[in-house]
Structures are given as C-alpha cells and as structure tokens.
Amino acid sequence: IFSLLLSMVACGSSNDDVVKVPDTEQPDPDTPQTGTDYDDLGWEHAEDVIKNMGLGWNLGNTLDACDYNQIHDGGDWMFWETCWGQSVTTPELMHMLKQAGYGTIRVPVTWGIHMDANGVVYSSWMNRVKQVVEYVLDAGMYCILNVHHDTGADEKAWLVASMKEYEAQKARYEGLWKQIAETFKEYDHHLLFESYNEMLDERRSWCFSTFNGEYDEEMAADAYAAINSYAQSFVNVVRSTGGNNVGRNLIVNTYGACNGTGTWNKHLIDPLVMMELPEDVVENHLLFEVHSYPNIDNLNAARSEVADMILNLKKHVVAKGAPVIIGEWGNSSENPSLENKIAFITDFVEQVKAADMGMCYWMGITNGIARQVPAFSEPECAKAMLQAFHGTDFQPELPTMDAVNFSYAVTYQQQWSEVHLCSENISLDEYKGVKVELDGAPENGSLSIKVYGETEGVEQYTSMTSDCLEVTFDSSKLGNKVRRVTLQCSLDTEYCITIKRAVLIRKDGTEEIQCPTSFWGCDVLLQK
C-alpha cells in the first residue's frame, strides 16, 4: 500500500445535517437531446440517460481502495482514499473533467471495511462519499455510485455469487443499500446507483461461473441465481426508501460484469444469457452493466472483439428490456504503444456510441498526483476519446503536468525506502532512459536511481552525486522492458529532498513528464 502526504480537505457535516440537494445542470450538451422521454416524475427513462450522460470516466483506486489485511481505522477516510497512491479528490478535478468534455463520473466505493460489526457505515466515511458525489454533481455531470471491492477475487470479499452466501449476507447487503439510499434519496436524476461491481462465485472465477477448475453446471446455475437475487434485493431496497429513489435509474451488473465475448469456451455467453431484468415498481428505469478490457496488440482483433461484444449485448441483454453501460473499459495489453492505445480508444468509443450504449473509461487519463494539480497525465488518450465522442472538430481543454510549475517534497523515513519515478512497464523499444533533477546535490552516497528489469531480481543502480542525473537503460542487462524506476535512499535516518523534475526519455530524445509518488517508506508532497 502506498501513502502520500497530501493537503487536507474538509470532510463535510455530520449525519444529523440536512442532506444537500445539488442544483446541477445537464452535462454537455446543456439541454437533453430532442426526443428525451420523461415519466410522471419528470425523470429521464434509462434509454435517455444513455443519450444524455455523455462520455464517462472512473474515479478509480480512490474510494474503492482497500486491503482486507490492513488493520486501520475504517473511519479514517483520508488514509483509505489515498492508500493506493491517488490524491485526495477535489472539486477542481471534477470541474477540469467537465470542462474537457466529460459528462459522467463513476465513483467506485468499497464499503465493508468502513462498517461496524452491526453493518452500520461510519458517519465519517458516508460523509466523505457524499462530499465526492456532490463534487461531481456540482460540476454539472452525472454520477454513478456503486458497491465495489466488497465483491471480487479477494478471498475476504463478502459479496459472493452463491445462494448460500446470498442468504448469509442478504441482511447486511440490503442494510448497506438502505443506508446509501436514505442518504441520497432527495438527490436528483443525475445520480445513479449501481448494485455491485464484479461479483464472482465461490471459486472466484472470472469469464463465467466455475471457470476456475472443471465446469460445474449446478454450481454455475447457483451463482447466476445468486446474481439475480442480489440484483432484485438492490432494486427492492432502493425503491422502498421513497423520495427520488422511487424513479432513480438503477444499474445491475452481470456475473463478474462479464460481457460474453469470445469463442474459446461455449460458457462465455452464460453471464449474459442467465442475467435477468429485475422486477420493478416503475418502468424504464433499469440499466445493465458489463466491463471490457480487450488485448490491443492486434488492433483488428480488438476491433472485432468490441463488435462481437455489442452484438451479444444487444441479443442477450438489451432484448430483455434495458439499455447497457460499459461501466469500465480499457485494454489488457501489457505494454501497448501510444499509437495502438489511441487507435483502440477511438474505435471503441465510436462503436459503443453508435450502438447507443454508455461508457466510463478506467482510469489512467488523470492519475496519481496529476489529479491534485489537476491535470491530464495522458492528454493524448483523453483527446482521442473526446474527439471520438464529440467529433473530430472538438478541441478539448486538457491542462497537462508540464504546463504547471511545481516540485515534489520527499521525506524518506526508512533505510532503502523508494520513490516511484515511473512504475508502468516501459518498453525499451520506445524509451532509452530516465532523468531526475533535484533542487540541490544530495548527500554523498545517499541516493541511487534503481531500475527494475524485465526479470525479477535484475536491477540497474546508478548513484546520484549531483543535482541532475540521466540514466541510460542497459537493455543487455534489463531485457526488453523496465518494470519500475525508483529513487532509493540508503540512509537509516530521516532525509528530505525536493525533486524538481522527473522525465522518461524516448528514443528520439523527447521527454515525457513523470509524476513521482511514494513506493514505500517515504512521503511525497506536491508543491506548486
């Protein structure tokens, strides 16, 4: 788990305060599209939410961040919000995204570690979630609020797709959604609820139920029945709380949020076929959700995979009476080129939009300390998706890290502690080195740039003796890629430095600004 020393943000009011009803406007375009269908409450139907919500983005690795083995106060919202290396969320970040052309923010939230033994959500956590939701709504965007890593592959995840686990956790799950629904019951139609994220069976199988191990028809049927039971419980509880929740648009996910794509196993389609539309007291206010992460090393194959996904969703899910949102999408390639990423993003957005489906990107366009500035850490990717959605003539406002004059104050607290300079897999076909600039020469022998090679245990060290050090990657030692680059401190006492600039150097000599963050044993503070 990573930590950042970040500026404090007020946590909001107590549970006794009146819930604020944000006075928000429609996202771009500022008025609903012609033909928007409203019910007696004056609320959009689900199909029209898809039309009006625009392009979406996930506030990922933030309120969803968790570690079931971590012993820490569940009410300490700032610790958990930043424990996966992200900055404290600010209103400025949401306004930047709105100004750029985004219309929806999905806010993933993990709840279980923030509940007491009786299933009551800590007031400090609920208030922080409420505050972040209001940041989104006040910026004029739609917001999707969910239950996130309470599901998933972790053995300690408490929401599991089996009827036995459903019966055991039903009261706690419904109690959680009752608390969420009561907190937000007077918020308007720009707020949507999502039932659960990627719920898996007792084997923690991705792709389809019982994929892990020999296929078990009985266990798989039980898992799909449980998914439908959780979905129905969610709808029933939210509607029962009254207020605006009577007509709120609600999202239910397939098993594992699987999208049914692929031909390598006949059971891949099962999560779509077995998904049911919950019964509801109102019509046309439910949506289905799936996720999509194609490998993009072969762009033609990725394009076909997206097209097949859309066909399957229309045939097996939309036909059941509700539209679809791709609640998470991105790519699963280990080290894709920027060219491939842009081509894939453009094609994905164009195909999904043409199919009248919604989409929320996961999540890299603004990442780490870039969110605190705020700025776009991947402006090329952001521009590609925005132009694919709004049209090639659309020119988004995309502030970048290199346009801001700031530095990073680092406090090393343990011997051998490290600051991330750049942590993604780095192809040595595209990059030749890294450069770091400090505000002064370090203490002799105290700092080294540490480069992690392709193979575990293979590392390249270069001692830093002046205020600037450029390191060329040694491919003969490191292999075809670099897994991580850090600035390591050898001192066994607290030691403070200021990083003025860190860049990756491309083969053509151009530089790519990096955002240093804590790896372990140190704090990093952004200084503007």
Labelled PLM ranges:
Residues 6-37:
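Bacterial Sec-dependent N-terminal signal peptides
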Residues 77-78, 82, 86, 103, ...:
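Extracellular glycoside hydrolase catalytic/binding regions
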Residues 377-401:
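C-terminal functional modules
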Residues 402-483, 489-515, 520-527:
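Extracellular ligand-binding interfaces
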